[in-house]
């Protein structure tokens, strides 16, 4: 099982996300990543292979990533070998390396679980002009959310709902939308997720 966390509030998100991921560790993960955003700025994605401490060192314990809204992930490889490209977060845009640094993408997300019909969904998205850079089912899931978001223009909740209708599997999902700064959208099916609210700040794990 992978670990996913999210935070939006007044504090800097990255140190909180790293601490949250450390509490979820229970075996040897192969990679980790964060996506953090400050206001209307683009989300910035940082990934690292190896242990969570490698990501912490790469970001100076989160201090090099400015932003009060973000998501994080530790990966145990299922689809795709351990690599920076296969590490989460994944992005909806056709970005080389599947998103690193500031990303222009409409949707950035992390996911825990298995998408059983990801190959079928990937073929659908390829027909609609999407390109893929990782071997993960997560990249397919994020780009499917993007597809419905742009097709129906009805907002994040409707896009995620339509995605869940098409997806088979057990999963938990966290996504951020470029058009909705300071917000994290979550969904789950048969996978655990908890949301906590305290002092006007929101935590997800």
Model-derived segments and spans:
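Conserved short alpha-helical segments that host acidic/polar catalytic motifs at enzyme active sites
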Residues: 1-205
């Amino acid at each position: 099982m992978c670990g996913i966390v999210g935070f939006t509030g007044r504090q800097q998100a990255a140190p909180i996300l790293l601490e949250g991921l450390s509490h979820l560790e229970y075996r040897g993960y192969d990679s980790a990543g964060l996506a953090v955003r400050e206001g209307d700025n683009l989300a910035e994605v940082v990934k690292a292979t190896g242990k969570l401490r490698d990501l912490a060192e790469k970001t100076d314990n989160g201090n090099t990533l400015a932003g009060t809204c973000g998501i994080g992930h530790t990966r145990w490889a299922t689809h795709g070998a351990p690599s920076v490209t296969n590490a989460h977060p994944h992005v909806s845009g056709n970005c080389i390396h599947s998103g690193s640094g500031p990303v222009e993408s409409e949707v950035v997300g992390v996911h825990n679980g298995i998408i059983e019909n990801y190959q079928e969904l990937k073929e659908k998205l390829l027909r609609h002009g999407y390109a893929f850079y990782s071997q993960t089912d997560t990249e397919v899931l994020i780009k499917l959310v993007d597809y419905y978001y742009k097709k129906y223009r009805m907002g994040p909740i409707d896009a995620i709902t339509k995605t869940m209708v098409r997806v088979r599997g057990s999963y938990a999902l966290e996504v951020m939308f470029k058009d909705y700064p300071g917000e994290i959208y979550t969904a789950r099916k048969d996978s655990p997720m908890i949301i906590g609210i305290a002092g006007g700040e929101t935590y997800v794990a």
